[in-house]
Design a protein with these regions (language model features):
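Surface-exposed extracellular loop regions of Gram-negative outer-membrane beta-barrel proteins
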Residues: 1-46, 115
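Outer-membrane beta-barrel translocator domains and adjoining extracellular loop/strand segments
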Residues: 24-31, 69-75, 82, 144-150, ...
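Transmembrane beta-barrel strands of outer-membrane/channel proteins
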Residues: 14-20, 42, 56-62, 71-73, ...
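Gram-negative outer-membrane beta-barrel transporters
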Residues: 6-12, 158, 162-285
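Extracytoplasmic loops and strand-loop junctions of Gram-negative outer membrane beta-barrel proteins
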Residues: 1, 21-26, 41, 85-87, ...
Length: 285
């Protein structure tokens, strides 16, 4: 929608996109839901004066970042616990026995990561030279990251010392062996909406008028971006301490990441030269 005001011009644009994942099982929280993404843009163009063309614009929008296939349908979790590993000089008398656990590692509460972004931009053109600067901010309160959980898995630990190897005529029978009841305590992970991401930055671009003597235009563009990752989801961690060659059977619960900050700045230069006689344009950057 364009609205002229004297010699000024206002332009307003609005749009909406609807997203949904089809074919999900009813166990998924996303099943049957529609996620709307709204976008609003406003531009104010000033009157052209003495070769100066100036405009200001701003935008606000939301976007839903859908989980990937690997996040929606992770592999089943398998854990093998060795109960007996008996070695005999006669290969026919050797035996290994394991307890295997299998479970579904899917997080059915997973939802799209919702990103909100706003930006303001200034564009200035003068006699074939153009400069644009954009400042933006983004925020996601439910970005994807690992969530941890622990499980205690019971198994029998058979004592190889209770086997009389000289009397064997076949692999040892488990029912005739002594054992102790043990359990394995460990930490596992799956995907969840537990990460908060805040991002802000400045993007810029300058394109010069083509220098007639060199038939060359200079373009410079780049950005500065700061990103902060924060997760208040507690994290489980298994003990790495061994006592009598056995893992210390404790699990610790720790606070989530209080904030990790990263910053990046990059600038690029590009020179494109037009050779009219050959009808060719060469670009270097």
């Amino acid at each position: 929608m364009n609205l002229p005001v004297n010699r000024h011009k206002l332009a307003f644009t609005a749009g909406i996109r609807l997203q949904s994942l089809l074919g999900l099982d009813t166990k998924y929280k996303m099943q049957g839901k529609i996620y709307p993404d709204l976008r609003l843009d406003l531009q104010w163009s000033l009157p052209v004066s003495n070769g100066w063309d100036v405009s200001f614009s701003g935008g606000l929008g939301w976007i839903s970042r859908m989980p990937t296939t690997a996040q929606l349908y992770p592999d089943f979790k398998y854990v093998d616990l060795i109960q007996l590993n008996y070695y005999h000089t006669n290969p026919d008398y050797r035996r290994i026995n394991m307890m295997t656990y299998k479970w579904d590692n899917t997080n059915y509460q997973l939802e799209p990561a919702r990103n909100m972004k706003w930006e303001v931009r200034a564009d200035v053109s003068y006699k074939g030279n153009r400069l644009s600067i954009t400042y933006f901010r983004e925020r996601m309160n439910n970005a994807f990251d690992d969530i941890t959980y622990y499980r205690s898995l019971a198994y029998k630990l058979y004592d190889p010392a209770s086997i009389d190897g000289s009397a064997l005529t076949a692999p040892p029978e488990l029912s005739q062996l002594t054992y102790t009841n043990e359990y394995n305590l460990d930490v596992y992970s799956t995907q969840g909406n537990v990460m908060k991401v805040c991002k802000e930055g400045v993007e810029f671009q300058f394109a010069s008028k083509r220098i007639e003597s060199l038939k060359t235009r200079v373009t410079m563009y780049g950005a500065w971006i700061k990103t902060i990752y924060n997760s208040d989801s507690p994290q489980y961690k298994a003990s790495s301490i061994l006592l009598d060659n056995k893992q210390l059977k404790y699990v610790g619960l720790y606070n989530g990441d209080n904030g990790t900050e990263s910053q990046a700045f990059n600038t690029n230069f590009m020179f494109d030269t037009y050779i009219q006689r050959l009808g060719l344009t060469f670009s270097t950057s």
